């Protein structure tokens, strides 16, 4: 068993998650069984109650874990499913230790940060390694080395280095200030100094910068950080994140890591990277472009736009576009400031979300798509709003609404799941939604059925997608919606919950209560996203 810790220096948001995912990809291409863990030093037990603009998208695992968005990057790069155990938080560690103390499992000892908290961290890491039968485990430590909350995790990493085969990869920012015109290495030197003060010497430094570093700067980092120059790896600005594994391989990073771990190369078969490179090159080309709008409420943060709230939706669009030979131009539309100046946009996606903010803007967008034959894909909340819009403007139920938006609506076409009522009443919000993968039975002959069949994902008319919601289409309104032309393409196996809807005689008007973006990757696009993008090209 071998472990690779990925740490960060200088500033957060450098792309440690993409670095970790890229290393996973290239090591898997060498024939190794790999997996990854994300450590988040916040005190929340999981990411389920975090605001998307606070910490990015909540990634939902197959078994229903609400985790950090970086697990999404890991899954997309290795094309494998992870679990909630792959996301460790300070809250989760302390919760477990306190539970054990209350049960008397420490046999009366004084419970301390060292060894009890550090042992719990190491045990969580080792348990994931054992459960997945992995040969190499990557552990990304969120934040930066200088964060107070990271100290205990770095101490656990230091201890593990004495017990197992461990490599340390440090990701550092090397700025090139416009007025100075040269890369500055001093911040990297300082972050490595902090790391060494904690007993950790990095084996590799990934230099995140605007462009590749020259030999002069690499020599300087090598000297002051006591690291071989060949282990200083370039991570320049790139057009698509899927290019990074290829950039790392050009620098022989996988071979260097395996040598450091005293592991032999299992294979030189890079066929999967060839296909990866082909799809990546499509996303970089300038000629064949499709313009797609994503309407959301978690886009703005202060005076800036941050797409991380919908990162999986954005990536799923890219996967489908690459499969079809196109590069997407994504237009982010703030639903609280909607302007229906959309003629140049070839298709619209309304992703998931919660609450009442920006709802009317999304409803106006759906009306525009339905009436103007603009391809539309609704996800989770997107399905619910598509139903509300249809009920109001086609079925004549002018006050139709969701009880999440208006508790007193006379026509609750969207209502809370029965099993969720007491949960909400008692304010038990964490990890209590309809979470994880669920089956749906598809109706033969529908667009949805044909798309899943095209990708060979149907067995006995059943498909599986991940979910995260409390509200559903109210069964009392099934008949009036269907009588007015809405097609229910898929139900839960018991026939109670509508999982997919579509409109006939429309270029593409499809919505799902699920989150198909969570099962999409560069080599295997989501059928719904594929169908949506394909319709945008017609």
Predicted regions and their residues:
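Pocket-forming structural segment of enzyme catalytic cores
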Residues: 70-79, 336-337, 388-499, 535-537
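Short, contiguous acidic/charged loop-to-helix segments that flank catalytic cores in large enzymes
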Residues: 301-304, 353-358, 464-468, 517-524
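Flexible phosphate-sensing "switch/lid" loops adjacent to ATP/NTP-binding sites
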Residues: 1-328, 336-347, 355, 361-368, ...
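C-terminal cap of thioredoxin/glutaredoxin-like
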Residues: 164-166, 507, 525, 529-533
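Cysteine-nucleophile active-site neighborhood
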Residues: 11-17, 21-25, 29, 317, ...
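Short FAD-binding loop at a beta-strand-to-alpha-helix junction that anchors the flavin cofactor
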Residues: 508-514
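Active-site beta-strand termini and strand-to-loop segments that position acidic
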Residues: 501-506
